[in-house]
Amino acid sequence: MSEHGTGARPGDDQGTTEQGGTRLEPDQVFDLARQGADVLLDLVDAGLPVELADQAGNTLLMLAAYHGHAALTAGLAERGADVNRLNGNHQAPLAGAVFKNEPDVIRVLVEHGADPDAGTPSARATAQMFGRELPEPGAR
């Protein structure tokens, strides 16, 4: 597991899971986050660690946010995923969403307490770099 991990590592007995009786390979779990698959929330509810991270330190929330899946990002945050957890490259989910220009994901992360100054580069610096503005907490 990366230095940031608190959950099980994919491939460990506690990090593997089953979906409808079918065993999922570790990469498949991360693919569900990249694809925005709602079933991932069911897996978390059934015991999959919400802070599960890949070898690069990308959590399920980071992957969902980076790939533009606002509803999944919100669902993971509501289940306790850390919206400020940095990956192995010291990148925060909010900065990734700003970089990818994902306004719905940005709004979700800000609403769940994402720190615009977390990570390198920070979301604030990324927004300035691309001439974008970050919403204020509570703004709609």
PLM features: what roles do these ranges have?
Residues 32-33, 65, 98:
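Specific position within ankyrin or ankyrin-like helical repeats
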Residues 35-36, 68, 101:
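Ankyrin-repeat intra-repeat helix-capping/turn positions
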